Regions:
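Bacterial N-terminal signal peptides that target proteins for export
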Residues: 1-7
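Hydrophobic h-region of N-terminal signal peptides that target proteins for export
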Residues: 10-19
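Thiol/disulfide oxidoreductase modules built on the thioredoxin-like
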Residues: 99-101, 108-155
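Loop/turn elements at helix/coil->beta-strand transitions in domains of secreted/extracellular proteins
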Residues: 39-44, 73-76, 101-103
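A short beta-strand-turn-helix
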Residues: 23-44, 67-70
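Non-globular targeting/processing and membrane-anchoring segments
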Residues: 161-164
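Structural microenvironment flanking redox-active thiols in thiol-disulfide oxidoreductases
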Residues: 58-99, 111-117
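Short pre-active-site segment immediately N-terminal to redox-active cysteine/selenocysteine motifs
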Residues: 42-44, 48-52, 126
Length: 164
């Protein structure tokens, strides 16, 4: 009897250790634009990134810290991963936990080039890529390349001051 109880306990513990990560939400260009529009009244930063992108991984701690400090000040952030949709649920969540990312992260559910073209005709699909939206939902700036906490802070402050 004792052996049976130990076997059951071991199987339960083993089962709990292999519970799958929750599935990350998928998005296409239209869905993302609708999500951005739902945040009217806030400044919105959209960050396109991937776990295979060195500069993306380097800037992630700054992005996470920026969001923690600015979410109460009317800033929303949305991360969009270009990781392969088939493996994103295994590769992305550990990176988000390790970097204490609290903002929503979505995974592109279509061809990256098509996504980039539908989201912004001028974007070639490079990452990291950022888009800044004012409180009315208007896109006011787009840029590519590794971005620091100080750069995000300056962009948001400039936008908030110019819209007063």
């Amino acid at each position: 009897m004792r052996m049976r109880w130990l076997l059951c306990a071991a199987l339960m513990a083993l089962g709990m250790s292999v519970i799958a990560e929750p599935r990350l939400p998928r998005t296409n260009a239209r869905d993302l634009q609708q999500r951005i529009a739902r945040h009217k009244g806030k400044v919105v930063i959209v960050n396109f990134w991937a776990t295979w992108c060195g500069p993306c991984m380097e800037e992630l701690p700054d992005l996470a810290r920026f969001y923690r400090n600015y979410k109460a000040r009317g800033v929303e952030m949305i991360g969009v991963s270009f990781d392969d949709e088939e493996t994103a649920d295994q590769t992305v969540p550990p990176v988000l936990r390790r970097n204490r990312v609290e903002y929503p992260v979505l995974v592109v559910k279509q061809n990256f080039d098509q996504f980039a073209d539908r989201f912004d005709k001028e974007w070639r699909g490079e990452v990291p890529r950022f888009y800044l939206y004012d409180k009315s939902g208007k896109r006011v700036k787009a840029w590519s390349g590794k971005t620091s906490y100080a750069t995000l802070e300056a962009e948001v402050r400039r936008l908030q001051q110019s819209r007063r």
